[in-house]
């Protein structure tokens, strides 16, 4: 096979009649008709020669290479290496199994620990929410008791405050969130 540039045709595929424009009969061709084609023909011949040399070198190189049954430089046979190699692979597999089991156990313990901690925190959260509700109920009860006591309070009358003043003070204290006695 010849090396070709894209768009070029090999010399064997081209006939003389295809190279030269045939406007005249075959015997009437002159030298000038071939003069402008010589660079193309020379290039085609050069590629053909290079291709032959390349093919010849490749075939001689392939003939010189011999295939052997075992790699060069290896004096130990496969049977001698196999027991040592197999033993090493077995030990490594065993260590890997142990490490994998250890890793799985550690992961399982960590998951269980996190689950217990999550349950504990949820329990504490529920207790705190219950305590908040209890304190809110106690606050409402104390406000109710205070409102029941206000009309009969003796201390209020001694301080000189009017019921309207007491009511405004009480509303202000509720808004601030503190009840001062």
Curated annotation (Swiss-Prot):
Residues 86-149 form the bZIP domain. One of its GO terms (biological process) is endoplasmic reticulum unfolded protein response. The modification Phosphothreonine is found at residue 162. CDD domains: bZIP_ATF3. Residues 88-110 are annotated as: Basic motif. It is found in: Nucleus. The keyword Transcription applies. SUPFAM superfamilies: Leucine zipper domain. GO terms for molecular function: DNA-binding transcription activator activity, RNA polymerase II-specific; DNA-binding transcription factor activity; DNA-binding transcription factor activity, RNA polymerase II-specific; DNA-binding transcription repressor activity, RNA polymerase II-specific; identical protein binding; protein heterodimerization activity; protein homodimerization activity; RNA polymerase II cis-regulatory region sequence-specific DNA binding. There is a cross-link at residues 78, 175 (Glycyl lysine isopeptide (Lys-Gly) (interchain with G-Cter in SUMO2)). It comes from the Eukaryota. Belongs to the bZIP family. ATF subfamily. This protein binds the cAMP response element (CRE) (consensus: 5'-GTGACGT[AC][AG]-3'), a sequence present in many viral and cellular promoters. Represses transcription from promoters with ATF sites. It may repress transcription by stabilizing the binding of inhibitory cofactors at the promoter. Binds DNA as a homodimer or a heterodimer. Interacts with KAT5; promoting KAT5 autoacetylation and KAT5 deubiquitination by USP7. This is Cyclic AMP-dependent transcription factor ATF-3. It comes from Homo sapiens.
């Amino acid at each position: 096979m010849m090396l070709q540039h894209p768009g070029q045709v090999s010399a064997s595929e081209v006939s003389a009649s295809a190279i030269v424009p045939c406007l005249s009969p075959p015997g009437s061709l002159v030298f000038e008709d071939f003069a402008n084609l010589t660079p193309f023909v020379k290039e085609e011949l050069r590629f053909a020669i290079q291709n032959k040399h390349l093919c010849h070198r490749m075939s001689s190189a392939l003939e010189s290479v011999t295939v052997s049954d075992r790699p060069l430089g290896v004096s130990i046979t496969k049977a001698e290496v196999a027991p040592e190699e197999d033993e090493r692979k077995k030990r490594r597999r065993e260590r890997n199994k142990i490490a994998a089991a250890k890793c799985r156990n550690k992961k399982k313990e960590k998951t269980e620990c996190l689950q217990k901690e999550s349950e504990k925190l949820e329990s504490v959260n529920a207790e705190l929410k219950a305590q908040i509700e209890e304190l809110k109920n106690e606050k409402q009860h104390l406000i109710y008791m205070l409102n029941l006591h206000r009309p009969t309070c003796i201390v209020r009358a001694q301080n000189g405050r009017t019921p309207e003043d007491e009511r405004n003070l009480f509303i202000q204290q509720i808004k601030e969130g503190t009840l001062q006695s």
